[in-house]
Amino acid sequence: GWLELGNPAEALNELAQIECELAVEPQVLEVKWQVLARSDKWDMSLPVAQAFCQAAPGLPQPWLHHAVSLYRLNRTEEAWNLLLPMAKKFPKSWVIPYDLACYACQLEQLDDGRRWLRKACRLGDGKEVKVLALADPDLKTLWPEIQDPRFELLSEEAEPAK
């Protein structure tokens, strides 16, 4: 409700009213993380993401949120290290390789960034992933390559380094 209306403060107030035992439910933690993320409250989002990982370790979303919180707190290497094993745990998720590509580029590991982005293209809709990547400042160093029509053709290269 409140979040869709663009009022994250009211959304947080509503979330504060939730009973303690319900506050650790994955759906509640997901909404709380979204509210904090949209409010740029990354320091507050991190413990919520950690609790979400404990509440729903079998889902990729908590791990993605945890990594994003770390990244937004300028802890990119920690985000990379957290998300890297999740690529194996959730092999069908294109978002995990995409985020790993972003983190690799920010860590100036461009070869890894290329390989992870190509893997994201293979797992997701390659054209949509490419459009998203060309609008993502985290991948700016790869933009000239991504614009090359052959970028998608090269997406059958070897798996990224683990």
Which residues make up each language-model segment?
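Terminal, low-structured helical/coil segments at or just beyond the last alpha-helical repeat
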Residues: 127-162
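TPR/TPR-like alpha-solenoid repeats
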Residues: 1, 35, 69, 103, ...
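TPR/TPR-like (Sel1-like) alpha-helical repeat modules
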Residues: 105-106, 110-128, 153-158
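Alpha-helical adaptor scaffolds
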Residues: 27-95, 103-108
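Alpha-helical segment of the N-proximal tetratricopeptide repeat
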Residues: 1-21, 27, 31-38
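Alpha-solenoid repeat scaffolds
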Residues: 22-25, 59, 93, 127, ...
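Amphipathic alpha-helical segments of tetratricopeptide repeats
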Residues: 20, 54, 88, 121-122
